[in-house]
Amino acid sequence: MLAGYVLNHSDCDDTNTLVHPNAIEIYGNGIDDNCNGSIDSDTSICGVSTIWNGTEWSNGTPTYEKSVIFSGAYTSTSDIYACAILITNNATLTLNHTLFIYDAITIDNGSYCIANNNNNIIQINPLATNTGNLMVHRNTSTIVRLDHTLWSSPVSGQNLYAFSPETLTHRFYTYDTLTNTYLSSTLSNASEFLAGKGYAIRAPNNQSANIPAEWTGFFYGVPNNGTIPFNVIHSPSNYFNLLGNPYPSTLDAELFVNDNEATIEGTLYFYEHTLTMDANGIFPTGTNYATWNATGGTAATAVDINHPDYHTPSVIPNGNIQVGQGFFVMAKNNGTVNFTNTQRTNNQDHQFLKTLTEQHHIWLNVASIDGNDINQILIGYVEGATMGLDVNYDGKSYGNTGNHLYSILGNEPLVIQGRALPFNATDEVPLGWFCDTPGNYTIKLSDWDGIFLGNQAVYIRDNYTGTTTNIKTTPYTFNATVGTFNDRFVVVYTENLSELSHDLAANSVIIYQKNNKFHVSTPNTIMKDISVYNLSGQLLYHLKNINSNAVILNKMGVSDQVVVFHIILQNLQPIAVKVIHKTP
């Protein structure tokens, strides 16, 4: 028998239809000895209590079995475990550690409970009703005046404008899924944070414009607890929704996604202020979003060299959604997501990794020629992923402006791609590249783990130049023109794989030079386009809408050098062939 409970060996009231005819009641700790089988409001599920009077405990230190009463000031020196909490007699409880509590938190008028930055309140009973106001402190990363942060409140009753009173009122925003816009017009002086909803809030107007510094937000209200539903929208034009952690504790991203897999896809997007919006509301090239799913996470690596904090590296999400943090999800349909107490966790600092499962990751960054990273993508070989599109393991590319790299699965551009185990060195992963500014760029490995910690190489094959580069040892620099290129780059793991299609033999392409003209033919199929590049990736010649299996190219206008013919067939299959161009 559990401590604090006894058996009533008398048969319960058989006339009560709510009680089984042969029931014998277990009573105590919240159940009265009246055979009605219900928990009465005038009873407590907690057994004994202990009181802190400002100097000492009346009945030993707090445990899960005790109702803990603070009638004097107390500052935590370690984690606190309690069945219930009462703060009374104008006392102040300051939490510098985690509070684990089974039942309710009661804070009398004139008393205070303060949860400092990076501390959790883990509440178990989803039906427990909290009363009184909790103050939660949350520090931002270093920000300047024009930076925005996505916030969500861990308490109810927090006025939106009062949260950051020095922020201009028209710089508080909600996100509208139907129009894909941030709106300030829907908010007013009476607006309060809604539980589970994310808000974009600019830094206070008295924050320095050029010296980055942390800013501390103060939430004040009744701590949220229990199941919190939030409606999401999937429209024909957009399915991104801005949510937020509604609890005064860290949220386990994997549990949240798994519990709501019928309603949302598995990738979460976290806004980072790595890029500064200009006066016209436009962001420079790059991405402001870090991402996470079951495969792993990517950083918002893009930086604005004009941002005072541009040298500070962005953090890769680790599967923990912090207190007060807003984030984007993709809705599969119109429906409801549920935040629950079982998703709450005390995991603060440790990387979220399934250490008992096999996994192999590579993180690729693309950078401008001056070395500034533009964006980051992840390819991971992990348990649970397949070679098809998996919404929990493949994350769609989102929030990019200007030049950016992505991997491709089917026709879907991805920032995270999960691949099936076991790892096979013959695997190939196509990459896509969007360029709006011509010039030289570099693809490099940012990090790797698993099998890649050993001798397994990672190559970038450039179909336009016909080169294959081991980027574990040497970043690959290429020249790019404006456009979208989904057939140029491939990640491979074996250097000598055929540069031609596996379905098309090399001798199916015939290229020869005569009188400064190139004769190109594909006897077995029709050509659509031909582009000719030098080994630096510069476009030398382009011919489109060929619709023939033979063509003559003249007036190439280049000196003696190796060039690469990049041929697109009628079925959109690419072929790359190196040819030596000789001047007659």
Regions found by a protein language model. Give the residues of each.
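Membrane-associated feature with strongest affinity for ZDHHC
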Residues: 1-47
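Short beta-strand segments and strand-loop junctions that repeat across beta-rich extracellular domains
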Residues: 27, 46-58, 168-180, 271
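Low-complexity, Pro/Thr/Ser/Gly/Ala-rich linker/spacer regions in secreted
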Residues: 38-51, 494-503
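Extracellular beta-sheet-rich ligand-binding/adhesion modules
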Residues: 45-128, 182-183, 187-188, 196, ...
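Boundary/junction segments of secreted and surface-exposed precursor proteins
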Residues: 45-60, 115, 137, 148, ...
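Acidic, glycine-rich segments characteristic of secretory precursors and extracytoplasmic regions
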Residues: 88-180
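Compositionally biased Ser/Thr/Gly- and acidic/asparagine-rich
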Residues: 187, 193-194, 202-559, 571-580, ...
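Conserved structural position at the C-terminal beta-strand
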Residues: 567-569
